[in-house]
Amino acid sequence: MGHCTSKDQKEGKRLNRRIDEQIKKDQSMSLRIIKLLLLGAGESGKSTILKQMRILHKDGFSQQDLEMIRPVVYSNCIHSMLSILRAMFHLQIEYGEPDRVRDSQLVFATVHANKEELTEELAQAMQRLWHDPGVRECYRRSNEYQIDDSAKYFLDNLPRLSSPSYVPSEQDLLRTRIKTTGITEVLFELKGLTFRVIDVGGQRSERKKWIHCFDNVNAIIFISSLSEYDQTLREDNCTNRMQESLKLFDSICNSPWFADIHFILFLNKKDLFAEKIVRSPLTVCFPEYKGQQNQTECINYIQWKFEQLNRSSQREIYCHHTCATDTNNVQFVLDACLDMIIAKNLKSMGLC
């Protein structure tokens, strides 16, 4: 009886040792996984940043991937023109040439028939429309209605997109917009660590899903679009997009969920902001602004507005000004961010 008890005790100790070793191994593995959340309002550029991470740190996009997004390119291009044509009616803007009415009817008929193929006839009609003074005037007022940021890019490239031999480029892919629903994830290895980057849809209806991603987060990259200071939300056509972004940043930055988490702020679409700020004053969003109407001073003011919302004296907000469609710019910024996250992770592990 005593012999059996002794044998059982030894077996129990061996089992406990194996369990302890597995726990230590699991803890070591978990410390080597860096979980990043990409958060921000809808259309801020989160999905584009995620695509850039795949290009820069994973296997990029194959030829098949590029060919598969051709219908999305066509759809984005056609719907961009459709948005302008609808806005012309509501803003009561006349076409520069009467013949453009017939061209616009072809665009409406194509969408109504659910045939979003960029045929030669449709492409030529859209090119004529895009060069029409009335259409250009309507596009200039694009902050007054809803239209994708990529509209000008795709419409400028209509001759290339409508070529029979057209294959989308990586830049075309970066410019495409598909509303993010649910959770999208990219995994990549860097300097012995596994980065798990998660993008969740930013529209109000999607934010309830964010809670499922909050566990074991190492850092948050919050993305806000600089160029949307004079635009309203697609969801309600009423709320200012920049004010919505500030409100969302406030709630996330000061949430108890993220009290000990590194916070990175990307003020995105600086290229579009540079074009817009010369003709649309920042006071549209911030009536109290008294500074110069130039890119640098206005961006610094917007950055200050975000940083003022941080109520923790222990937390530093790491801010970067980005253009999500510029791979070189994103690489420079991401390298700095990831190096900072790695250094702080090693410090938390007691390795530096």
Curated annotation (Swiss-Prot):
Q: Where is the signal peptide?
A: none
Q: G-alpha domain: which residues?
A: 32-352
Species per Swiss-Prot/TrEMBL record: Caenorhabditis briggsae
Put simply, this protein is called: Guanine nucleotide-binding protein alpha-7 subunit
Q: Which PROSITE patterns match?
A: G_ALPHA
Q: Which residue stretches belong to region G2 motif?
A: 172-180
Q: Which residues form a coiled coil?
A: none
Among the GO biological process terms of this entry, one is: adenylate cyclase-modulating G protein-coupled receptor signaling pathway
Which InterPro entries does the annotation name?
Answer: Gprotein_alpha_I (IPR001408), Gprotein_alpha_su (IPR001019), GproteinA_insert (IPR011025), P-loop_NTPase (IPR027417)
Q: Name the positions where Mg(2+) binds.
A: S47, T180
- Positions of region (G3 motif): 195-204
Query: What is this protein's gene name?
Result: gpa-7
Binding, GTP = 40-47, 174-180, 199-203, 268-271, 324
Q: Which Pfam families match?
A: G-alpha (PF00503)
The UniProt GO MF terms for this protein read: G protein-coupled receptor binding; G-protein beta/gamma-subunit complex binding; GTP binding; GTPase activity; metal ion binding
Similarity remark = Belongs to the G-alpha family. G(i/o/t/z) subfamily.
Q: Where is the lipid attached (S-palmitoyl cysteine)?
A: C4
Quote the function comment for this protein: Guanine nucleotide-binding proteins (G proteins) are involved as modulators or transducers in various transmembrane signaling systems.
Q: One cellular component GO annotation, for this chain's record?
A: cytosol
